[in-house]
C-alpha cells in the first residue's frame, strides 16, 4: 500500500561493519525465543573476543495475546569473526526469569573480570559476579575538566601485528543503562601496548607489561 512501510525481519540481528556496508547476520535461534530489551557487549570470558548478553522477556500483554517470556537472559560468546555460541543457564550461571530490561557491565569488585547487572520490570535488579573469565587489563581514564570519565575515549590492545577490538567509553549503553567507565581489556600473549584515541582528537600509545593488571591514562598527564 502506498505510504506504508512493512517490517519483514523480526530476528535479533547483528550488523557487521564490512567497510562501506553492513552485513546482517541473525543471532542464534536460542536468542530469538523472547524479545530483548537491554544488550550488553563485553568480553566476559576474557579470550579477546566480544560477547553479548540479552535481557529478555515481555509479559504484560493483553488477554488475547500470549506472554513472550520464554527467555532467562541469554549469554552469547563470540569467536571474533561475527559468530556466536549461546550458553544455557547451567553453563553461564545467569538466570533472569522476569522481564529483563536494562543490562550493564562493570568490574565492580576490581578483579579484572567484567560483571553484569540486569534490571527487571517490576522486580529486583540482579548482579551477576563473573568468577571464571580470564582477568584482563583495567583501564582508568581521566578525560580532564568537563569530561572526567573520558566519555568518547576509544582504546584497544596491541600485540605485535594483532589488534584487539576497539572499546569506547560511553555515557549510555542499551536500554536505560550505562556501563562502568572503567574498561577491562583482554591481555593476549605478546601484548605490548594500549592504543588510545581521545575524544577531542589525537592518538596515544601507552606501553604495557606482561601480567600488568591496571593502567591509568590521561591526555595531559604521564601514564602510570
Locate the predicted segments by residue.
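Gly/Ser/Thr/Pro-enriched helix-cap/hinge segments flanking short amphipathic alpha-helices
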Residues: 4-12, 16-35, 55-224
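Extended, hydrophobic alpha-helical segments in both membrane/secreted and soluble proteins
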Residues: 35-40, 52
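Acidic carboxylate motifs that coordinate Ca2+ or other divalent cations, activating on Asp/Glu
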Residues: 47, 51, 111
